[in-house]
Amino acid sequence: AXSGKLQWIGASESGAEFGQGNLPGVVGTDYTFP
């Protein structure tokens, strides 16, 4: 589920994918894991 690099902002289901280090962010702040 990757439509764009900006989708991570409100993504919770795909958070795990972007959380690998592709984008800067903090778990629970910028994205959450289901």
Swiss-Prot record:
Enzyme class, broadest EC rank: hydrolase
Domain of life, per lineage: Eukaryota
Keyword match Hydrolase: yes
Assigned EC number: 3.2.1.4
Reaction(s) the record says it catalyses: Endohydrolysis of (1->4)-beta-D-glucosidic linkages in cellulose, lichenin and cereal beta-D-glucans
GO molecular function: cellulase activity
Keywords: Carbohydrate metabolism, Cellulose degradation, Glycosidase, Hydrolase, Polysaccharide degradation
GO biological process: cellulose catabolic process
Other remarks in the entry: Active towards carboxymethyl cellulose and 4-methylumbelliferyl cellobioside.
Protein's name according to its UniProt entry: Endoglucanase 1
Organism: Sclerotinia sclerotiorum (White mold)
